[in-house]
Amino acid sequence: MEGSAGAPLRTRVCIIGSGPSAHTAAIYAARAELKPVLFEGWLANDIAAGGQLTTTTDVENFPGFPEGILGGELMDRCRAQSLRFGTSIISETVTAVDFSARPFRVASDSTTVLADAVVVATGAVARRLHFAGSDAYWNRGISACAVCDGAAPIFRNKPIAVIGGGDSAMEESNFLTKYGSHVYIIHRRNTFRASKIMQARALSNPKIQVFWDSEVVEAYGGEGGGPLAGVKVKNLVTGKISDLQVSGLFFAIGHEPATKFLGGQLELDADGYVATKPGSTHTSVKGVFAAGDVQDKKYRQAITAAGSGCMAALDAEHYLQEVGAQEGKAD
């Protein structure tokens, strides 16, 4: 990393993000001697450096940790490994980019980096609802990832509730019936917006019951400050409030990809995720790559994010080799 006081820093690869995809990209790029610079952000999207995993307690589905590992600890280890191989980490949030010409410009409020290649790995934030008790029982029975947390012992053979009405809500509700005694779907409207086939699967499942025209107004715990014990559900038509004793509540109301800072410089899909070429991490701008949940709205797992971070680093390395070869021929 080059640069004098007040001058832009110069690097081969700049990585934007701090989750599994960003740090895996950094590890691979650093080992390839590309001397990556990584902007990890400062409470970017209101989440600490490390991404969504820092909001998770036990991670039990990441290979290599048979006893599980705390989400924050896993990301601390990823960060340490990035540093070990020579990644320069800047604890600032990227506010602007310029991908119109090489070198690409990536800037926070106080630091500018010029890079020959960029990896965008800023993730996506699960949408959360806020009501009485929603923050107090977050990660204590309330979650936004059924695949990540649904198999936890606290949910097994216990009633579970899901909020949502789209395909993800239907899919997660069916998934949770493998573990919970039964699942309540709570939806604000009297019809689902999910595809017909996904609706049919959920509505035909004997372990699923739907609360139409309803919303959760309160979450509460057991005696002695225990985890989630139930929720109060209000019918928006009648005003009646029902008390559901559940051990789990899952938000399935979508995710918000962190792409606003891009300023329209990369092609996005209809849901705001960075569009990548099939089978690669290449974006609409040559030399700019995307990895992790910022381009993945299907899997959204730590392990798949890490895998795509590896892909992005390898794609960036190959791109730089090609550019170098072309420039050599031009000389």
From Swiss-Prot:
Keywords: Disulfide bond, Electron transport, FAD, Flavoprotein, NADP, Oxidoreductase, Redox-active center, Transport. The keyword Kinase does not apply. Its cofactor is FAD. GO terms for biological process: cell redox homeostasis; removal of superoxide radicals. The active site is a redox-active disulfide bond. Homodimer. Belongs to the class-II pyridine nucleotide-disulfide oxidoreductase family. Disulfide bonds join C145-C148. Binds 1 FAD per subunit. It comes from the Eukaryota. Possesses thioredoxin-disulfide reductase activity. SUPFAM superfamilies: FAD/NAD(P)-binding domain. It comes from Oryza sativa subsp. japonica (Rice). Signal peptide: none annotated. FAD binds at residues 18-21, 39-40, 47-52, 61, 94, 148, 293, 300-302. One of its GO terms (cellular component) is cytoplasm. InterPro entries: FAD/NAD-bd_sf, FAD/NAD-binding_dom, Ferredoxin-NADP_redctase_2, Pyr_nucl-diS_OxRdtase_2_AS, Thioredox_Rdtase. Its EC number is 1.8.1.9. This is Thioredoxin reductase NTRB. It is an enzyme of class 1 (oxidoreductase). The record marks A169, R188 as: Important for activity. The gene is NTRB. One of its GO terms (molecular function) is thioredoxin-disulfide reductase (NADPH) activity. It catalyses: [thioredoxin]-dithiol + NADP(+) = [thioredoxin]-disulfide + NADPH + H(+).
